[in-house]
Amino acid sequence: MKIDILTLFPDMFAPLEYSIVGKAKDKGILEINYHNFRDNAEKARHVDDEPYGGGQGMLLRAQPIFDTFDKLNVTKPRVILLDPAGRTFNQAYAEELAQEEELVFICGHYEGYDERTKTLVTDEISLGDFVLTGGELAAMTIVDATVRLIPEVLGKEASHKDDSFSSGLLEFPQYTRPAEFRGMKVPDVLLSGHHVNIRRWRMEQSLRKTWERRPDLLENYDFTDEERQILEEIKSEGK
């Protein structure tokens, strides 16, 4: 996968050189390029200006962004604009983006963008109902969530399939050695070696956590008969 990031602050992306994303780059699975669109700004490198019609704040001018985009070595990229008014990012969206060969991120700053910038864009994405100072943190979040889903990045294909949201449910609790720590014990079923019971316990825990914390995820979830039965048992406990 090739990723190009248009930003005023390329140094902010240093964390992407570490951990999973950094390893993907080292393996040659991923290429990331950073482009400071101030370098292509006319008018003494000014990238912003006052909005027509008046209003608070400054808007990013279209010219520096367009000229930077025109210089990218891309064919048919998915072009992502980070915007609080965009479609909310989630795990399903990350899985969708992980299928792409080329991604371009446009990171805003100041009050917003000249609307004409959006003619370059295929996707407007938001992390949620809040506003960040710029799009850089949002872009890093999306890159990390997406890159880890690329085959060969995590090593084991199944290693992300049990993550929260990958299955449509929140992840079940997990434990490692020792079996008891400061009086807190690992559930007996996980020490039993009985794989059927362990699988059912994990299913029950995942459903319980989702029901208690994110019941909205269950609205469109495709239940198996066993899962539906377990969920009904969980619901009946509170009656």
From Swiss-Prot:
<comment type="function">
    <text>Specifically methylates guanosine-37 in various tRNAs.</text>
</comment>
<keyword id="KW-0963">Cytoplasm</keyword>
<dbReference type="GO" id="GO:0052906">
    <property type="term" value="F:tRNA (guanine(37)-N1)-methyltransferase activity"/>
</dbReference>
<protein>
    <recommendedName>
        <fullName>tRNA (guanine-N(1)-)-methyltransferase</fullName>
        <ecNumber>2.1.1.228</ecNumber>
    </recommendedName>
</protein>
<keyword id="KW-0949">S-adenosyl-L-methionine</keyword>
<dbReference type="InterPro" id="IPR029026">
    <property type="entry name" value="tRNA_m1G_MTases_N"/>
</dbReference>
<dbReference type="Pfam" id="PF01746">
    <property type="entry name" value="tRNA_m1G_MT"/>
</dbReference>
<dbReference type="InterPro" id="IPR016009">
    <property type="entry name" value="tRNA_MeTrfase_TRMD/TRM10"/>
</dbReference>
<feature type="binding site">
    <location>
        <begin position="127"/>
        <end position="132"/>
    </location>
    <ligand>
        <name>S-adenosyl-L-methionine</name>
    </ligand>
</feature>
<dbReference type="GO" id="GO:0005829">
    <property type="term" value="C:cytosol"/>
</dbReference>
<comment type="similarity">
    <text>Belongs to the RNA methyltransferase TrmD family.</text>
</comment>
<dbReference type="InterPro" id="IPR023148">
    <property type="entry name" value="tRNA_m1G_MeTrfase_C_sf"/>
</dbReference>
<comment type="subunit">
    <text>Homodimer.</text>
</comment>
<dbReference type="InterPro" id="IPR029028">
    <property type="entry name" value="Alpha/beta_knot_MTases"/>
</dbReference>
<dbReference type="GO" id="GO:0002939">
    <property type="term" value="P:tRNA N1-guanine methylation"/>
</dbReference>
<feature type="binding site">
    <location>
        <position position="108"/>
    </location>
    <ligand>
        <name>S-adenosyl-L-methionine</name>
    </ligand>
</feature>
<keyword id="KW-0808">Transferase</keyword>
<keyword id="KW-0489">Methyltransferase</keyword>
<keyword id="KW-0819">tRNA processing</keyword>
<dbReference type="InterPro" id="IPR002649">
    <property type="entry name" value="tRNA_m1G_MeTrfase_TrmD"/>
</dbReference>
